[in-house]
């Protein structure tokens, strides 16, 4: 658990992320949604989906965000496995013999 002071500081930081200088409201919601999905934060995903509806963000934009998170995640996993294969000198072609 956070101390009261830590919680106040966190709350202040979190609130500051909604006071954007460069991102418009719709972009902020889509960035938040993508981060929430990537971090597997179910309450956060729900929050940003509710915000997306309030901002009238179309289903297509939400679908594109979900697809982008999926693509980055899949790419990261592929690179992770490639790195293990390279580090340990594993030849997958030999598995067909």
Residues covered by each model-derived region:
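Hydrophobic alpha-helical segments
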Residues: 1-97
């Amino acid at each position: 658990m956070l101390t009261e002071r830590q919680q106040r500081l966190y709350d202040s930081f979190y609130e500051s992320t909604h006071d954007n200088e460069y991102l418009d409201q719709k972009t902020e919601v889509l960035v938040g949604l993508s981060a929430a999905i990537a971090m597997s934060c179910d309450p956060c995903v729900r929050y940003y989906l509710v915000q997306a509806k309030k901002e009238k963000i179309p289903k297509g934009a939400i679908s594109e965000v979900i697809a982008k998170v999926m693509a980055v995640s899949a790419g990261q996993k592929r690179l992770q496995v490639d790195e293990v294969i390279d580090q340990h000198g594993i030849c997958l072609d030999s598995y067909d013999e």
